[in-house]
Amino acid sequence: LVVTVSIDNSERISRLLEKKGITHSVLNAKFHEREAQIVAQAGREGAVTIATNMAGRGTDILLGGNPDVLAEDLLREQGIDPEEATAQQLADAKASADEICQKERQHVLDAGGLCVIGTERHESRRIDNQLRGRGGRQGDPGITQFFVSCEDDLMRIFQGNQIGAMLNRIGIDEDTPIQNRSVTKMLEAAQKRIEGFNFDSRKNVVQYDNVINRHRRIVYLMR
């Protein structure tokens, strides 16, 4: 599961995967009508899904796939409308789907579960934690990995210059991966600052509303 912060980024990654010949699904606001189906099959063996951070929220990704959704897909492959299928056809499709999902679930478990990749850190630590929670749900195995660049909006606005200068002093080129506690702390500090700004903005809105509310109450009393 590859998670991006915007639709543009998700489509950009989709184009890169297409050039590499990697089969994948894209889940963003443009394809909201297929959201449930895409999320349901995101846990299948070998499945690659690109999603924005808001897409598919509140939906569990079942390792091995969702047998109910797969059963409908199997019927469509046979040219049968799931809503018009007979009871026997539904039962046969469900049995086949259960067998496929159970087998794939074991393969996915053996491979380490769902791998969640964040293409950048978000302004809110809460959203990052939600992404971490996508992998390893309900006792299943899973991993989460974030990739961060000094050119990301979060880094560029607040801490990018400092981190870039630090890396230049160390003598590390831009293609070398960095896993360092100092970088993580700087990221968290930037997120805290943004959260503080957002809190102050909401606080100011409430204060403005308190002033307007006095006028509103007087007008309502006059009416």
Set out the residue ranges of the language-model regions:
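C-terminal accessory/connector segments of nucleic-acid motor ATPases
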Residues: 189-223
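A glycine-rich phosphate-binding loop feature that marks nucleotide/adenosyl-phosphate handling sites
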Residues: 6-9, 183-187, 207-212
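Conserved strand-helix element at the start of the C-terminal RecA-like helicase core
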Residues: 1-13
